[in-house]
Amino acid sequence: MYTVNDVLEYVQEEDVKFVRLAFFDLRGVQKNISIMAGQLESAFKNGVSFDASAIYGFETPEKSDLFLHPDPTTVAILPWRPNTGKVVRMFCTISHPDGTPYKKDCRTLLANAVKKAREDFGMEFRFGTEIEFYLFKLDEKGEPTKIPFDNASYMDIAPEDKGENIRREICFTLEQMGIQPEASHHEEGPGQNEIDFHYSDALTAADNAETFKWIVRTRAASAGLFADFSPKPISDQAGSGFHINISISDASKQRNMLAGILKHAEELTYYMNCTEESYDRLGSCKAPKYIAWGRENRSTFIRVPAITNDDASRIEIRTPDSECNPYIVFTLLIYAALDGIKNNLEPSEDVKENLFTEGSSSLSKGICTLPDTLDSAREIAQKSSFIKEALGF
């Protein structure tokens, strides 16, 4: 793990000329400011100021100065940039001018949730993501179309699968940036792909997910394609999910964790599915809308996968999509899980039916559904005392 001195030495020895200081708005959109390498020591010591009124969800113009503080443990070379005059990236924490943490810094929000789980509950959470995306062709002006790069389907191979070389480049780039992909394959939709990650701590997993989306877009653009992470880019094809796998250090608390997340599912939805298009995806093509859980059941909100010895506490949240802010979603999932653990909550019985085909009977069984529009999800979240306490704003 790099220290400040390690990074300063690395920058000098490796001919690094530019340092990108990255952070995120409340939607999870990555922002950055690029500084010259000679300014890095000052950035570590004093921070770098920016106009928070220009960032979505942050501050108003009358009091808008905030400071970025690079986290040396997140330094990574950008492999697609030149080898002479190299470029590195670090994620940042955000503070007010007096040094107090900024409450809407989503990386700090997640770090605080991790700290509470560790110090108050003796729990460590680990996250793994499965991120789906489409590759579309560009038109003669270089603008994205809705024409898929190929017409392959689930786990097809070349020549039907035209995305394997791009996935290969993406995986190589991830490894060069210190991220370990586990598997990649073609997904169900034409031009749709998926790459899965090795489990890691919550903050690293969120950093990796955001880095992944950046790499995919960059590598796709280099290949003359457009990478689309939206939840339902083609109305009659499979949507793209952001499946979240969670495990805890004490496997005996899995049921409590599961129950806590189910309890708060409606409140979480606005943050896991934060665009109008998100709600076109839910309810079909393995994107559940019923608040239930099942063993190996992909039609439920939470799936408990077939387990091996090293992931006995793992659960999978199947509804989120890639438009979400992973820092905020992971934060809320941790607090929901802790609520279940603290109050020793127990989940309802697991569902064995296919809820995509048995949905009408599910309502009569008392299985609730997620909000079906962005407006209804927003209203539920705005009224939630759980959300207010977890996020603090």
Feature-to-residue mapping (PLM):
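Glycine-rich, acidic/polar active-site loops that bind/position phosphate-bearing ligands
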Residues: 1-393
